[in-house]
Structures are given as C-alpha cells and as structure tokens.
C-alpha cells in the first residue's frame, strides 16, 4: 500500500512517486521540476520518501538554470585546531557576499521591541513566504511547512525547512518541528533517502539576535558534514546511555566536549527504528520537546548568571542521535560572523582576507568570543534557578 503523497500538475505522478520511494532508481533526474508539486501529509510518508534524490534533482536543475548562487570551492582546507583538537574546514563561499539579510535588529542592538513598520518591511522582503518554485522541494509538509533550497548554499544540497506562514526566528521550536527535523535526519542518513556519498546530514537553528541568522522568518537548515570531518559530538555520546527526560534533573547532567573553548550542552537521543503504534510516535515527540526545553532552560541560566543584556540567543544543532545547544553572546568577533556552523568545525568566509584572519585569530578564540567561555570546573557547576 503506497502512502498518500500527492504530486500535482504532472501526468505520471504515480510513476514518479515510485521512483522517489526507490533509492536505486535514478530516472527522477530527468524530471523537470517546474511541472511538479509535492505534498507530504504525514511523518510516515516523509519517512518513506526518497528525500535525497528529490533534493538532488531540484538542486541540480536549479544550478543548471542559474537559479542558485553556488560554485564548488576550490580552496577548501582542513585545519586542526591545536587547542581543541577539532578538525575545521575553512573555505571561501561564493554566495556569502551576495546573500541578503532581513534581520529584526542588528547584533549588539539594545532595542527591546520591534516596531510595526520594521516588521512590515521584513515581511515584504521575506524570501520564504512565496519561495521560488525552482527552489521548492516539498510544497506542503504536514500542511504547515515547506522544504526549499538555500538560494545561496554553503555546500551542495543545502536546504531549509520553513514555516508557510510568517513566524519569528526568535520563537521556540515546537514539538512537531523537532520531530520533523529528526525524521528528515533519519531519512537522509539511514532511511529510504540515504545519500550514496557517505556524507552525513545535520540540522541547525540559529535563534536570537546574536545567533548569526540573516533571515527573521523561522527556518531550520540542513547541510552535509564534510567527509573529512568527524563531529566531535560523536565521541562525546559514544557508549553513553540516552537521556530519559524524567531522570534528567535527578540523575544526569548534559555532556560537553572538554577541549572546547565555549559553553555548550549535548544530550544523547534515543534512536527509533520504527513506530508500531501512535503512542510510540507521540513518545518520541514528547521526548525531543522535553530535552530541547531542558537545554533552553539551562541556556537561560547562563544569561542570568552573566547578567547579560543580550536577549536569549543560541545555536541549536542536531543529528539523529544527539542534540546540542550553544548559548551566544556575540554574532561576530572582529568582523568574523558565526552562526551554528563554526561550532560544527566549518568556517565559511567571503574572501581570502577573511580566511587569513580566521587562521590568524584561531578557531577556539573566535568561538569563545562568540559564545561564553567554558570554565575549568564546568562539570561541577550547578544551576539553581530552574533546578538544573
């Protein structure tokens, strides 16, 4: 029995659907994207979709037609940070200098509210409300979301999950959004849509004025890890039991990478291979939401402790078996902007001058200044405001 994913405006919809579900078929590469719209109504349909082939098809077509601002980097370097022992990719990204921004306020601003006129301007200049059809991968996901390509991608097959209606980037992720993220990661990394190159996808959400975001419309991003880089978080969560939400406060503390220069918190996730009942699916959703809110509350303690004027800002990063949060106090250090990518070992810059500056300042210094410094007794720190 086939799921009820809908393809509109394309006469051979059922054939296409069969190809999307079958990762061994590559005829989908011949689809002309503008003749097809894709609707995914349930998480189960999303799990069974050959998502990577669909993303790849839309990306390759858009690139060939000039709808993307992208070219492969020719000067990418992998550099090990002598302090953190983390391997970092440093490269010049063509689209960064052309990428527009549509922020509610500039980093460092002490404005506490957004004027109505400013909000209206942002909505007018919002690229996600009516995305370009050539960049759209899934037109409707669970009725409330879209999956679209990043027009100025940092790497191949860089895409976004966006809300259909305008929502602020500073709003919290809700339980269904967390479950969609987790389902997409499962699909791309080990499910029907697993990409054949071996690279692994991660997701990231930049929230708050100092988080490094450029667009105020709510969006979560997905990118592949460079093949040469192993996420340090994998070593942190290896041989560790997953967190059980009800046991967090009593028995467990979040994990962290001890060689890092910046405060961050990592939680190991339970991996679900399949769901036999609706109750199991709800259990995953509730668990992800509880763990995410635990990280949010712990981050709020950081801002309270530092009595920082900055509104809550953070980078939330997730893979299939862990989630991490990095509280942020600065969006940039000496003109070097950082969003979540730096905390995954990816330093992407506009030009050679900025590349040399990154190498001169050092990865650990940049990340420490953009986040909060990791303390020597970090593993013994107890926060009392929320009981964590």
Annotated model-derived regions:
Residues 163, 204-230:
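Histidine-centered divalent-metal-coordination microenvironment in nucleic-acid enzymes
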Residues 3, 196, 214-215, 309, ...:
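Intrinsically disordered, low-complexity regulatory regions enriched in Ser/Pro/Gly/Thr
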Residues 181, 203, 220-222, 235-237:
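Compact, aliphatic and Gly/Pro-tolerant "microcore" segments centered on a short helix or tight beta-hairpin
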Residues 143-145, 157-158, 199-203, 216-220:
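Generic beta-strand structural signal
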Residues 157-202:
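Short N-terminal edge-element motif at the start of the domain
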Residues 1-35:
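N-terminal amphipathic/basic-hydrophobic helices that include classical n-h-c signal peptides
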